[in-house]
């Protein structure tokens, strides 16, 4: 780097290669009359349907499937980026790696969703489901979350523990998506810096 010969350091491999990611954002689309969710095709905004993503916990994909079933059952309008019409834009799911608590955030191009009691009851079947939040995003563009959040069920946040500290996590909170590797990163940095409980770190 910059002409310097740096000492090689060992790579700390992640303890898990599957099921580790604690956050997912699924864009929603409709094709042939049926709603589906997945991820954008590389370099495009074309949504590719995905039933199971192996880097996510099974509960996260289960939430996505429940929401899509609800959308199809009650014919909830799906957002169309080309016309800026429709309602549901994204399904956002966050799961505490330690607590197992799950936050579901639905991003909408409007003020609400129909038949919410039915959706909430269906989500209660998912172990760890804690809260349902609405994010209102009526702007054109690539931003997923909007500026307005409405709590529809539960406290509006989940809790989780990292490096012995407890955190409240909302849909807007920054939190490393690989919990186990983040903890190893912080612990390694503390050890290399020789930080003790008596030190004040700025």
What is each PLM-predicted segment?
Residues 1-202:
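Accessory RNA-recognition modules of RNA-modification enzymes
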């Amino acid at each position: 780097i910059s002409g310097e010969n740096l000492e090689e350091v060992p790579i700390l491999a992640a303890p898990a290669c599957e099921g580790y990611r604690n956050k997912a954002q699924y864009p929603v689309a409709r094709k042939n009359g049926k709603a589906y969710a997945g991820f954008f095709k590389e370099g495009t905004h074309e949504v590719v349907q995905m039933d199971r993503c192996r880097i996510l916990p099974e509960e996260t994909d289960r939430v996505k499937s429940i929401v899509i079933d609800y959308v199809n059952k009650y014919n909830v309008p799906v957002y169309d980026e080309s016309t800026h019409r429709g309602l549901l834009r994204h399904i956002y799911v966050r799961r505490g790696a330690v607590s197992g608590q799950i936050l579901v955030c639905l991003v909408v191009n409007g003020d609400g969703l129909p038949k919410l009691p039915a959706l909430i009851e269906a989500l209660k079947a998912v172990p760890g489901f804690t809260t349902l939040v609405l994010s209102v995003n009526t702007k054109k563009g690539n931003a997923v979350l909007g500026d307005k959040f409405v709590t529809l069920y539960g406290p509006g946040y989940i809790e989780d523990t990292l490096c012995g500290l407890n955190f409240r996590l909302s849909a807007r909170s920054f939190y490393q998506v690989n919990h186990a590797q983040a903890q190893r990163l912080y612990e390694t940095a503390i050890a290399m810096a020789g930080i003790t409980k008596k030190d004040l770190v700025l």
